[in-house]
């Protein structure tokens, strides 16, 4: 018996909706504080955290984590507790 491939419509409806957690620039958190939070909470390594902090500073925002909205919500709450401005889009 041969399995028939799913149609494109069926495949797209069964996918998990991927969301992104964005770090938004602000004027009150220090660069080091942002890097420390990203390494501790988002499991970024030092270089990745520094790059995200720089991109956020110069571009206004940076995508820091990708995943399902239910997985991103606790990360968002933890970062917000440390004073970072984050948003799930």
Residue map of PLM features:
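Terminal domain-initiation and capping elements
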Residues: 1-89
